[in-house]
Amino acid sequence: MATTVGASSQFTSGVLEAAEQELRRTVSGEVRFDKFSRVLYSTDAGNYQMEPVGVVIPRGPEDVLATVEVARKHKIPVLPRCGATSLSGQCVNHAIVLDFTKHMDRVLEVNTEERWVR
């Protein structure tokens, strides 16, 4: 029987270890699966607390794509996080948290006609 990790029993330690190893190989930004980082990212400005399975701090769009691909392969949800100012728990979940605040913190382009932002 597989062991489980963290607050969520839906992911086995083997799945999380494989995902972490793949992320470390493919992401140029920071990959944090340690207990301290997971606890640090388990809350936002609200009262909710849910420990993520890991945290990725992407340096650019390639890191975001790599994270989503690894998460999809291992069936792990992805949760984008920016300001963590939600009072209703939108920034916390049993997922891989993508923290955009360190390197990807600017709007590069706004297209009002097509209604998208990059």
Question: What residue ranges belong to the model's regions?
Answer:
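Noncatalytic alpha-helical scaffold of FAD-dependent oxidoreductases
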Residues: 1-118
